[in-house]
């Protein structure tokens, strides 16, 4: 599972001094299934919350490893909240090479797609409206949008085919 974080633009009517929200994303390496949430900051606690509440809880399959950049939300001391959450859930951690964000290309690309197809195409009335539209877009991305990297299938179709195979 590839993870990344992006600072979101201010909403219409917000001032430059207002606190910015952050978009957390996770994309499955095999199926390209997307998980995303908007959280109030880019801390280890928010990353841990994203992992447990927005990734592990709704994900129907086992997450063996997460791959992220070396940001402070993902990497730190021995008692780092995100690292502890990974450890407690039996999830390994791997990191990109320092100063090489392109080595986390899947997460970087899905953020670009989200910003182009979701955020830049709409005007949001409120943070709640933006969150609601993010949920709608993630559903569209996973169940309707064909993916070139999946030979025109959706992440849902890839997972459906995988889980309908007989167990050997």
Where are these regions (language model features)?
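Active-site beta-loop-alpha junctions of metal-dependent nucleic acid enzymes
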Residues: 19-20, 36-61, 65
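Mobile-element integrase/transposase regions
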Residues: 1-27, 33, 49, 61
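C-terminal domain-tail junction helix/linker
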Residues: 89-91, 113-168
